Regions:
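Conserved tyrosine-mediated DNA breakage-rejoining catalytic core shared by Y-recombinases
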Residues: 7, 12-14, 175-183
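Conserved beta-strand positions that form and line the central face of beta-propeller blades
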Residues: 3, 28-30, 102-105, 172-175
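N-terminal helical hairpins
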Residues: 28-58, 71-76, 92-93
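Short, Lys/Arg-enriched alpha-helical recognition elements, typified by the DNA-recognition helix
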Residues: 57-163, 175-177
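Short amphipathic alpha-helical interaction/hinge segments
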Residues: 49-52, 122, 126, 163-170
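Basic, Lys/Arg-rich DNA-contacting stretches centered on the C-terminal catalytic core
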Residues: 16-24, 136-140, 180-183
Length: 183
């Protein structure tokens, strides 16, 4: 099943699992304390027994979204405009902030912090994924609550596919969408 080894000042949990193709693999995770390692060992053993173990994956949010968009667009027959807007949203509003994060490491709190950051982000901060130099006047115009709500809708759908693809157990997107200001 799983075992704990002391390695210098840290503890490693070692375990065997099968990847998506059924090939046997070895995994290990390192923790600062023995208590953390024991907790993870118990979790890994339970997940291996009941078949809910997630194969460790280094896929980033950016990689996942760029795999998801073509599938989603062909499945739901998106118009070229919808496709272009979705890619632009990923490029300019998501990737610069959480794109390099691993999908498996993202938590609801991280997404909520991301929404808070977006609410303080000037419009046009990124164009084609490249940060722009904005004038003081341009910096006054922040992203609208509607734009942040659209980001939430895209992420909620994308992360539900990540659950279906066995990348994560549950979606990190908050249950409640950011409110749209009607002022």
């Amino acid at each position: 099943m799983a075992s704990i080894m002391k390695r210098g000042n840290t503890y490693s949990v070692r375990y065997n699992y099968k990847d998506h193709a059924g090939k046997p693999c070895k995994g290990w995770e390192t923790f600062k304390t023995k208590a953390e390692a024991q907790e993870r060992k118990i979790t890994v053993e339970k997940e291996l027994l009941d078949g809910t173990f997630l194969v460790p994956d280094t896929m980033t949010v950016e990689e996942m979204l760029y795999k998801w968009i073509p599938i989603q667009s062909s499945k739901h027959k998106w118009s070229p405009k919808t496709y272009t807007q979705s890619v632009a949203m990923v490029q300019n509003l998501i990737v610069p902030y959480i794109g390099k994060r691993k999908v498996q490491d993202l938590r609801t709190y991280d997404i909520e912090q991301f929404y808070a950051t977006l609410s303080q982000t000037p419009c046009g901060q990124y164009v084609h994924g490249v940060k722009q130099e904005l004038t003081e006047n341009q910096k006054k115009w922040l992203l609208s609550s509607t734009s942040i709500h659209e980001v939430h809708t895209l992420l909620k759908t994308a992360f539900s596919y990540a659950v279906d693809w066995d990348l994560i157990h549950k979606s990190p997107t908050p249950r409640e969408a950011p409110k749209i200001n009607t002022e």
